Design a protein with these regions (language model features):
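Periplasmic-binding protein-like
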Residues: 128-131, 144, 174-179, 203-206, 212-213, 284-306, ...
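A ligand-binding cleft/hinge motif common to bilobed small-molecule-binding domains
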Residues: 107-111, 229-249
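Extracytoplasmic ligand-binding site segments that recognize negatively charged/polar headgroups
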Residues: 41, 46, 50-58, 78-81, ...
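An extracytoplasmic/periplasmic, membrane-proximal ligand-sensing/linker region
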Residues: 301-344
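A bilobed periplasmic-binding-protein/Venus flytrap-type ligand-binding module shared by bacterial periplasmic
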Residues: 147-154, 191-192, 262-276, 284, ...
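Short, polar/charged alpha-helical segment
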Residues: 31-46, 50-72
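N-terminal export signals
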Residues: 5-26
Length: 344
């Protein structure tokens, strides 16, 4: 969808605008709610925004502002981890400068919720989300899944093990981006699930037959060019590549029940009481915003009833590990381990 079309669509006033939210929600059968049925946003609101995907989060904010002219939205931008630490420091000092925190990763969300800065969210808002993504003090916005992009001319699907741990002992040439934050979160999940000893051995094994890239788009492009057989990357890099090159020699494989199929999420936390912060979150969970981020950013909608990006397996068919995503907050042991092995 073109940016202008999205802004106009979200800003357009509809016949349902004046309905109370509870009534509008009852009219919705799929779980997703149209912005036309949401209450207007009025007043001052400060949002701390972690860096989003290619400015698309900024487009969402502009659309919300255009639809709600009486909303005075102030945005502070920065890295999610740095903003989370700022919120914790402000909370300890008894200073409140932010009403909302929208982060690109759950680790940063965990830092804020563990500090006691998050306000509880109402049941009707949480019930819009998939059952496995409903939390009392924060709301996921969109998801991303760890995948194994592979070259379809060099690798057959049956050559790819179901366990990501088994790749350390395979003959496949592997592409990875150890300095990339999402990869480090993936290794953190592996540490939590498998232990430091097994993770250290895995890093050593992979490093023997891996090619290093600066980022995970580079990994996927390297796979497609045949520089490597298989790689580690978030799902959307492959979908973006294939959207511009439908016949690209790359497809997605998924491991089962381990960190290689981890589903992470961007999320938002209400830091102030009252209806305004909560109603702002409702806009992010609206059918229009969820569909926009699925189409343009290839992110996974976590609200029930919204179509996932084309080319991605349905979440219900995947086997991600069961874990508290907020535990991914502390990367320091992971970075120390990666430096010890020599991959950083």
């Amino acid at each position: 969808m073109q940016r202008r079309t999205f802004l106009q669509g979200l800003a357009a006033a509809g016949a349902l605008t004046g309905l109370p939210f509870s009534f509008a929600h009852a009219m919705t059968q799929t779980g997703s709610v149209s912005v036309e049925s949401l209450p207007k946003l009025e007043g001052d609101l400060t949002l701390y925004l972690g860096r989003g995907e290619g400015g698309l989060y900024e487009n969402v904010l502009k659309a919300i502002e255009k639809r709600n002219p009486k909303l005075n939205l102030k945005v502070r931008r920065g890295g999610s981890a740095a903003l989370a630490n700022t919120i914790v420091a402000e909370t300890k000092a008894g200073v409140k400068r932010a009403d909302l925190f929208w982060a690109v990763d759950t680790g940063s969300i965990g830092v804020v919720t563990d500090a006691g800065a998050a306000k509880p969210l109402p049941d009707d808002l949480r019930s819009q989300l998939r059952e496995d993504f409903q939390y009392p003090s924060w709301s996921p916005v969109t998801g991303r899944v760890r995948t194994l992009p592979y070259n379809t001319e060099r690798v057959k699907p049956e050559q790819i093990p179901e366990s990501v741990m088994a790749l350390a002992d395979s003959d496949l040439k592997i592409g990875w981006a150890p300095a990339y934050s999402s990869f480090q979160s993936f290794v953190t999940a592996m540490r939590i699930l498998e232990g430091d000893k097994a993770t250290k051995a895995w890093l050593k094994g992979i490093n023997k037959h891996a090619k290093k890239y600066a980022g995970e788009l580079g990994v996927v492009m390297g796979v497609e060019r045949g520089e490597v057989d298989i790689g580690f990357a978030n799902h959307y890099y492959t979908l973006r590549l294939k959207s511009g090159k439908p016949n690209a020699n790359v497809a997605l494989a998924y491991s089962k029940g381990d960190a290689g199929c981890l589903v992470n999420a961007s999320g938002i936390v209400a830091l102030s009481d009252g209806d305004l912060p909560v109603n702002f979150i409702r806009y992010l969970l609206s059918h229009e915003v969820q569909s926009y981020l699925a189409r343009e950013a290839y992110e996974i909608p976590l609200v029930q009833g919204v179509e996932p990006p084309q080319g991605l397996a349905d979440l219900s068919t995947l086997s991600p590990p069961e874990m508290d995503l907020r535990k991914l907050a502390d990367l320091r042991p992971t970075l120390n381990l990666m430096r010890e092995v020599g991959v950083l």
